Amino acid sequence: YLVVFRGTDETIVGWKEDFNMSHQTQVPAQDAAREYLTKVMTEFDGQYIIAGHSKGANLAIYAASQLDKKLQDQVSAIYAYDGPGYQRDFLETEGYLAIESKIHAFQPEDAVVSQILFHTVQAKVVACKGISMMQHLLENWEIDKVSFKERDSVTPGSQRLQATLGQWVDQHSAQELEAFFGAIFGIIEATGIETLNEIGDNFLMFLISLQREIRDTEDSDLLKEGFAQLQAIYKEQGDETNANFLEVVQGKIDSATSFIKNLVPDALLPGKSEDKQVEEGGDPQAKSEETDHGTI
């Protein structure tokens, strides 16, 4: 059997949960993945391959680590494609260590997502088209007949990003990380934006609203201090060339916006599916359910 977990959708809520992984021992999607995988493997006896892309890769590994020994023995392999990592404590748990040797990890040469938090399995580096977050799209991964075209290592920029984020996370407690990311997403949510697509479609208005919320928030000093620390660490990781961390972040945001626009069909954007159904004579009340659960 093959169980595959999907990644994050375009909602701000979904991305907020991704960053919550930096300070929460378990996020709701991980718990749902654990429950789903346990249920499926209990119902259908046999050997399993578990896989996932992006956040789905994180869920695949996490869910497998939470299985009891009998079910873990039925997992033949786990394939993780450009997924964010874990807190260091998780990587030392008995459940994770039991399935560590079964993990096959892959990341693009200019990786961003898989450079967040920590891993113990060395990922194979895949040659890709595009740069930055556009390489997160699997359609941009290069294939040679039946296998990925590989590179020796990720780009220097990707290495620097990983070193910066890793050192910054190590320097802060769970409470400090929760406060920082809570402030960031609190500001974004205060602008009324609910999806990354809305940011891309109304970027100028979003920036104006964001500046206003940052100016008015009680967490302004907290955010300034956090970004100043990131900037200082980033400079320590290399020379002064392209040493502005905020400019790098802006580039990642621009790339992420393009990434989301390529990832999500118009029919799945808020309001678009109903318009299309009405045009085609369909039922505008019909809704589809999307979850982080896998499929078998």
PLM feature segments, named:
Residues Y1, F5-Q47, D68-I296:
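Alpha/beta hydrolase fold serine-hydrolase catalytic domain that processes acyl esters and thioesters
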Residues G52-G56, A60:
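Gly/Ala-rich beta-loop-alpha elbow adjacent to hydrolase catalytic centers
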Residues A60-K69:
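Short glycine-enriched nucleophile-adjacent loop
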